[in-house]
């Protein structure tokens, strides 16, 4: 069984694609990313939320927006706020460290050795 993990930021430009890239080749996980903004590279859709077993958002505002727009789809999904500000570029080493440290405790049980 594979755990489907969705990472969400605003524009799907720096933070969530970095998280997707970090975890996408991990056995036991399937990672995707999207943004809450209408002009995101990939915008969050109901289909993506249904697909996801676990959702990580970078900031509280992303959770607020998802809940406002998709409350019923999120009722029984684990949704974690990482509190990672929009201060980093794609694959920034500091961003990678923050993402790994904040998500690994939740993802470790699902990683296949």
Model-derived regions, located:
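Phosphate-binding/catalytic loops
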Residues: 67-113
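Conserved active-site segments centered on acidic
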Residues: 1-54, 64, 101-113
């Amino acid at each position: 069984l594979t755990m489907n993990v969705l990472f969400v930021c605003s524009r799907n430009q720096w933070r969530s694609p970095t998280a997707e890239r970090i975890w996408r080749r991990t056995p036991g996980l399937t990672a995707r990313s999207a943004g809450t903004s209408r002009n995101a590279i990939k915008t969050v859709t109901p289909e993506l939320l249904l697909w996801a077993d676990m959702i990580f958002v970078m900031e509280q505002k992303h959770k607020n927006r998802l809940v406002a727009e998709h409350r019923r789809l999120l009722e029984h999904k684990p949704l974690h706020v990482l509190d990672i500000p929009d201060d980093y570029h794609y694959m920034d080493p500091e961003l990678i460290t923050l993402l790994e440290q904040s998500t690994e405790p939740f993802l470790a049980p699902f990683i296949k050795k």
